Amino acid sequence: MLSAGTEATECALKLMREQGIKKGKRRGIIVCIEGNWHGRTLGAQMMSWNPDQKNWIGYHDPNILHIPFPYPWDTVAMEDPKQFFKNGIENLCHEFNLDPSKDLCGFMLETFQGWGAVFYPSEFVQELSEYAKENDILVTFDEMQSGFGRTGKLFGYMHYGVEPDLLCCGKGASSGFPLALVLGSAEVLDLPNIGSMSSTHSANPIVCAAGRANLECLFDDGLIEASRELGVIFHNKLEDIRCRFSEHLSCVQGRGLLAALIFIDKNGNPLASLCDAISELCMQRGLLVVHTGRESIKLAPPLSISEDAMLEGLSVLENSIADCISMNKS
């Protein structure tokens, strides 16, 4: 138990490498995914992708590498997600002269890409999982944004039909208190020496009580089921909104009570400034949405929300989109 999500992903980085040392691996290669994000501390930023956010780092760990993400708008990736993974990992191993069974220690995956709620095709993740088993490589899911019911399942990785070795959790683990977790088998979690994987305020009584209360609410109040059931209504309404504004709103991504609206015009131009305007107008009208700084707006209503309140919020969103598009035209 730790205090921040970035501590948890760094913990997983250390655990994967310690397991590699135990297994006699030659190098501590961690394979991450392009476009993913894992935190703001040094190791977490190097596992993340955005090069512009890493230009302050003087030394880039040569044993943290990346393979391409299978975006749903990438026709090559969608034609054969399994082969897309194979091509990515084979190209990586060829470029850096790697033997996967001797050099690769771990895969780090964000369960979905946070900026756009973009999930992997299940076949991609399943092929990655099989590859990891064949080569004695640990698989870690970064569940900071997807865990604890957000996607209609307890953990987001459950949509893929695989079993990871490690889970990094936060945010929804305590609903606002500074609690992060790394979950896994005792074989892996017990690798570090006692005291080498601690944090000043980790596992303090207040956040542990909050985490327990959070779990009780999730299960006793049926919030995971509510996320799944309300999520159907949520996404149906968002699809109606997408159809209405199809010249500006290209697609809606997400599952459960999680969605991202991707604003790209018919010519393929990202509409980040339109997202700015919509987010601002929504806020003025009492609805908080997340503008990611890109061409997307994220929605993540409380798991305890009522259907009426959710539909009211979506009505505010729809009207705000309409008004901003109208203002842009004028």
PLM feature spans:
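Conserved N-terminal phosphate-binding loop of PLP-dependent enzymes in the Aspartate aminotransferase
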Residues: 1-330
